[in-house]
Amino acid sequence: MQETEGYLTAADGGIRLSACLLFAYACLTMGRIDHARNALGEIRRTLASGGETDPAARAMEAFVAFAAAVLLHLPLPEEMPPAESFLPLLPPGLRAFALYVQAHYLYLKEDYANSAGMVEGALAMGASAYPIPAIYLHLVAVMDYMSLKATEKAQTHLLTAWEIARPDDLIEAFGEHHGLLGAMLEAAIKPNWPEDFKRIIDITYRFSSGWRRVHNPITGHDVADDLTTTEFAVCMLAARGWTTREIAGHLNISANTAKRHISEAMKKLKVKNRKDLKQYMLR
């Protein structure tokens, strides 16, 4: 966070906006929510001002504003241009990450098949050459395939992301996406890398707390903040229509254990049936 703070007032617009985005997300994990809101506000104001005329610079403004909104599951700014107008103008590595953001946007629209297709196409066309964008692309593919109940494809993408991440310990993305991954971390990472899983979950608790403090007030969507990560992951599946037996099989736990997680979550959230869980879950 301190490394980016000095660039928040940089004269170069691309550097300043990149710093704002990185700084905002670092602040979410650190619990500095007012600082995160200020950085996100600067991003929105820059796009709204429309002062930049250079196409490449304007594309950078649009990308950063797009990423800031989509990754916090917020409405897009009114001034947001179509993605196809700015994606081609971004440098290749950044374009790969922007395709992750676009795929994430399609996921939020429940267009899971097209989102997954975008990921597969991006990876096939060279995005795998950029490790960090590749990790994020594989993770959004997990989100898509779990939404489509294609668990084998989801696991393949998760483990590919894990293979890319492990040499340099790039585990932050896994913690950031935990609740969206359909309990795949519990199913595939926890049994084989338990200590790494614990570190990922520590990131999840810190990041998601800050994320909700920005997301919930703006959207009025009260994403649950009093569940354990396992309860949340199980409830995400239950809210999407997975049966207790399917959840138990996915996590390799007993049906009674799966039912206990759901019952405890319902008690905490004061709801009486599984359908009511959905209002407290991520989209």
Language-model features, listed with the residues they occupy:
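Solenoid-like repeat scaffolds
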Residues: 5-16, 42-56, 81-95, 121-132, ...
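Linker/hinge segments immediately adjacent to helix-turn-helix/homeobox DNA-binding domains
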Residues: 67, 77, 91-121, 126-134, ...
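Extended, charge- and Ser/Thr-rich helical segments
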Residues: 17-22, 27, 40
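Helix-turn-helix repeat elements of alpha-solenoid scaffolds
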Residues: 1-4, 29-44, 69-83, 107-121, ...
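Helix-turn-helix DNA-binding segment
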Residues: 212-263, 267-283
